[in-house]
Amino acid sequence: PSAGPTRAVEELYDCQADPQDLNNLAKSGKHREILKRLRTEHVRHITATADLGFLPESEAWELFSKQTGWELGQAGRVPLAGIHQAAAQVGVASERVFLKNLDSDNPTIRYWGAIGLAVRPEISGMAKRKLRRKISDPSLAARIEIANALATHGDIPNALPALIDSMQHENLIVVTHAARIIELLGKKANSAKYAIEEALKRADKIRPADTPATVVLPGDKDLAMFVSFSCRAFLNKLDE
């Protein structure tokens, strides 16, 4: 298929007849029962394994500060059912569902609610107003995605301050998240240039720029590489 800005919400391929996975059968009536079976198995699997991959990375590492992910998952201490459902709604549910998710007490559900709005082709004025009200969400992951949703739908002035502020956070996972959003905004986020330059200096101080990407280093030295990737890509776009 032709390259595009997004992928299909669901993909189903006949790997024997179509080894290059070019013909997506997810909407094929002939394959409906297979798709239903795989959906059911997917839900069973992520439930049985207590899949924590739906947590934003900054929130996950905060949870893992005292217990491992395995211990948390097996003990049922993370309310995964609602999180899994919120993630599954992205690209499928109505705007109303995502606005409701923004009001959840669970920060990860708010995070997925914001992503759900960001990927919609367009959102209402009411949704934009709600995103503006939520831009100071106490969860940094949710806040960054709320800013992303606003920026994606044209409200750069209200989105950028939250992203720029996040670029100065002590946690480089948060910085990486914000830097990636700014990188993807490209020249529309021109006013973030100084914050990006400062973050790049910080990253290069932690991990020298000439360190090969194939060298895996612990902690912030590894995260600094990803901050550097996004910062350099953004600055290169500004120079084009």
Task: For every predicted segment, state its role.
Residues 30-33, 37, 108:
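Generic recognition of stable, solvent-exposed alpha-helical segments in well-folded globular domains
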Residues 91-103, 122-136, 155-168, 188-202, ...:
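Amphipathic alpha-helical scaffolding segments comprising HEAT/armadillo-like alpha-solenoid repeats
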